[in-house]
Amino acid sequence: MAAGKLGTGKAAATVLHEDELVIAIRDIAPRAPTHILLIPRRHIPSALHLADADGPLLGRLFAVAADLARSEGIADAGYRLVANVGRWGGQSVDHLHVHLMGGRAFEWPPG
């Protein structure tokens, strides 16, 4: 996922939602039958860079996730929301994003 390329038109992704705060796209390398990335429009390197003032952004991001889970038909069975932080946390892109995954059962703890 190339979050930095979204605004340039160079990222090959299916956009599912756009508003002034959040963009949601289908992951180009899905790890579940439904795998969507929710990305803040404003550049935030990771969750470590969030502040109290980002509350409205996070509220919007989670509301969009819930709306997409319903529209994708995965809300009732359940889904997973994941934000990877740092190298050991699995973060591979230097832009905060949340994975919405569903359509199959997940194990705990994750790999």
Residue ranges and their predicted role:
Residues 1-111:
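HIT superfamily nucleotide-processing domains
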